[in-house]
A protein has these predicted regions:
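Structural motif of enzymes handling amino- and sulfur-group chemistry
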Residues: 65-141
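Conserved PLP-enzyme active-site core in the AAT-like
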Residues: 1-65, 77, 152-153, 180
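Conserved PLP-binding catalytic core of the aspartate aminotransferase-like
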Residues: 130-165, 180-190
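A short linear hydrophobic-aromatic micro-motif
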Residues: 129-130, 168-173
Length: 190
């Protein structure tokens, strides 16, 4: 979900980013948490390649290969293998299928829709919930718990009441710097 607002719009490497964790849920249509196995590959710039742990996927002249061990000559500074398995492989396949089915232009549109939907939802909910910040948001909306003041209701109570009414609640208490944070991540393809 952390890539939703920029997928198809920019390349992290062009921003000087050397390492990035990409959540496959939401951005690339894979389940998360209670809805299924989460998955988040970590991508590295070429500059950090020799330090990467294994297993890893490398692009060699347009062919993608799975590197299982760090004994290869270009991985001499790797600290070795992280796990004995390759993560939630089904989620990688699902994400790749999603990307291929949308294509470059489709992914760019998905990104634009994510930002549009988030801002529409923010505007729609702002008379009921308190936005943590003024102005536009990207692909998710952050509210604080000011709307609950003087009610005796806490953020957790509010989220549990949503479950009682048949709604999946938003992420609560994250990020930690926002008191009583309620993080809403609308979908962009439904």
């Amino acid at each position: 979900a952390n890539f939703n607002a920029v997928v198809g719009k920019l390349k992290p490497g062009d921003l000087g980013i050397d390492a990035m964790h990409i959540n496959l849920h939401k951005t690339f249509s894979t389940p998360h948490g209670g809805g299924g196995p989460g998955s988040g590959p970590v991508v590295f710039s070429n500059r950090l390649e020799k330090f990467c742990p294994t297993p890893l996927v490398k692009n060699i002249k347009g062919d993608f290969i799975l590197v299982e061990d760090s004994n290869e000559k270009d991985l001499t500074k790797s600290f070795g293998r992280l796990n004995v398995f390759h993560g939630q492989m089904g989620m990688f396949v699902r994400a790749m299928s999603y990307m291929l089915s949308h294509g470059a232009d489709g992914l760019k549109q998905v990104s634009e829709d994510a930002v549009l939907n988030a801002n529409y939802l923010r505007a729609s909910l702002s008379s009921h919930l308190t936005p943590a910040f003024d102005g536009f948001c990207m692909h998710e909306i952050l509210f604080n718990d000011d709307f609950l003041k003087d009610t005796g209701v806490e953020t957790l109570d509010f989220a549990k009441a949503m479950i009682d009414e048949g709604y999946h609640p938003m992420t609560i208490y994250f990020p930690l710097v926002i008191h009583g944070a309620l993080l809403v991540e609308p979908t962009e393809t439904e």
